[in-house]
Amino acid sequence: MKTSFTEPDDDSLFSKFPLSPAVKVIIVIPVKNEEDYILNSLSVFSCQTDVLGNPLDLEHFEILILANNCTDNSVLHIKDFQKKHPDLHIRLEVTTLQKSQANIGYVRKVLMEAAYHRLMRNGGGIIMTTDGDTVVAPDWIAQTQKEIEAGADAVGGRILLCQKEIQFVDQWTLHLHTKDETYHLLIAELESLILKTPHDTSPRHHQHFNGSFAVTTDCYGRSGGIPDVAYLEDCAFFERLEHIDAKVRHSHKVRVHTSARTIGRTEVGLSYQLNVWKNLGTERRSLMVESAASIVSKLVRKRNLIELWNVRKCQDFNIFETFKKITNEIPTDDMLYHSFLESPFFGEWYSKFKKLEEIILMKKFPRTCLDQALVDLKKEVVIYSAPSFSQTSIR
């Protein structure tokens, strides 16, 4: 049965399906022509475990699947899987979207909204999302719940390439992918060392993407949900979470493996990035990235601004003078300073400051080749890891 809808919050979507009062987790999966992957993706949900390896109660979660514009056997495979696993609460909607809506941003938003409203009927819970070409770990749900119970508002899981498919990726593409991963992991390590964010300590990673992401209904509601974008909705949503100072945990214990295909289902995504790296190899061009010096400069300044923001209501020292000292390289004005004092969220204010900062940093620190950046980042990690290293106080 096909469902037609025009608004992301259309209450008719999935409304015909019963909701067990025990459900506290809803997983959403968008599907478009995933006949080669969807069965592997779904199979692991029938054998989810807790963190000790004991079977997870299937009554505690359900899976919402929106199959849109499929021209292959994806829907048949899903329905067949449903019949073979009647105890697994899989809710399937099938639709053909018009061109303006036939994009991953719209579909993911529709799914997340549906999950949010269903969970709110049960008093709230956790919305989780993955993809139709991705296989989650057996303890994926449990490890996510553990991170949220520890205080996180949202959890980004570690997304790895499917080992069986890596052998089919050309060596240059895999080479660049590995180096790019190392680059971002080193940045994540520096963020941990410099910012010392209590809810996202080392070991941590850099991914907060659709292959493995979770958010509490409370945080989802406060953030305003996923913005109206055609793609990269995960990045847009993460920005919204940053704006409300959400506690986002990048956990290595939450793991998935995703397809290494280079022909994807969205305009921009991992498959798109793999193709970019492949073309760089064909053209023998170097991958240019932000330099270690720029990254450290940005992180140290952000740390100092966070410290100042936390004491901005104090009267025992000159806030304005300290603010100007921290931001001396950045052209700030009185309006930006006053918004710093009054903003309810640091992240909301910092998003405005960051735009000004990026202009200056691009001029001061030219982009560098990836190999050099890796060398420099490793040096910075050693420096900031030293027990004797003393961070400069804003006071």
Report each predicted region and the residues it spans.
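N-proximal low-complexity "stem/linker" segments adjacent to membrane-targeting elements
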Residues: 1-59
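Conserved donor NDP-sugar-binding/catalytic core segment of glycosyltransferases
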Residues: 139-180
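A recurrent flexible, glycine/aromatic-enriched loop bordering the glycosyltransferase active site
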Residues: 184, 191-213
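Conserved nucleotide-sugar donor-binding
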Residues: 208-224
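Terminal low-complexity segments of carbohydrate-biosynthetic enzymes
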Residues: 276-395
